A protein has these predicted regions:
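Active-site SXXK
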Residues: 1-11, 80-88
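Short, glycine/proline-biased beta-turn/loop segments that scaffold the active-site neighborhood
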Residues: 9-24, 107
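Short, surface-exposed loop or secondary-structure junction motifs
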Residues: 24-195
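Short coil/turn segments at secondary-structure boundaries
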Residues: 2-5, 22, 47
Length: 195
């Protein structure tokens, strides 16, 4: 949505949206590299010492790529988390607000959340840990940006319908849907879109 409204350029360096990342590797890693997991080898998860909001930016500042941006795809929550974080920066809102107050309502999703509100917790699915105790996605650095939204079955159907037939959506949302349907990076017969 940020790209469709002209607030985010997928080709721009990541450092354009977060000056603290400027003067180094993120001047050569694009927003698109982050959105397609081709930033240069960010790990699957943040290391424990950086898995919090206080240390995540310094982690990115100190991180060293394993390969050139755009040359290899490696799934990474920090990579997609930074993509979401910079997208929110471009919209000048926290990601939760950008999603829950702007984008999700434009898609007609009334029971979809980045952070499930207390009034909906009884409907929020859970898994079980090795100890048999209930578990859900835990908090961590860029969790809202990387771990996805929580939705109801009826909203999931609305989301699928919006993606199959976006003609009823406002024009910026139609463009956003189209951007997410575009393949940007191909490897081993698979084409990667955003996220």
């Amino acid at each position: 949505y940020a790209a469709a409204t002209g607030k985010l350029k997928l080709s721009a360096p990541a450092s354009d949206y977060l000056p603290a990342l400027g003067g180094g590797k993120f001047d050569h890693i694009s927003i698109l590299n982050l959105g397609t997991y081709t930033a240069g080898g960010l790990p699957l998860q943040f290391p424990p010492e950086a898995d919090n909001n206080q240390h995540m930016i310094s982690y990115f500042q100190q991180w060293k790529p394993d390969f050139a941006p755009g040359t290899q795809r490696l799934y990474s929550n920090p990579c997609l988390g930074l993509f979401g974080y910079l997208t929110a920066q471009s919209l000048k809102q926290p990601i939760d607000q950008a999603m829950e107050k702007n984008l999700l309502p434009k898609l007609g999703l009334k029971h979809t959340f980045v952070k499930v509100p207390p009034s909906q917790m009884s409907l929020y699915a859970q898994g079980y840990g090795k100890d048999g105790k209930p578990v859900r996605v835990g908090p961590g650095a860029m969790d809202s940006e990387a771990y996805g939204i929580k939705t109801s079955a009826s909203d999931l159907l609305r989301y699928v319908q919006a993606n199959m037939n976006p003609a009823k959506l406002e024009s910026a949302v139609q463009r956003a849907v189209s951007i997410t349907h575009t393949g940007y990076y191909t490897v081993d017969g698979m084409t990667q879109g955003l996220g």
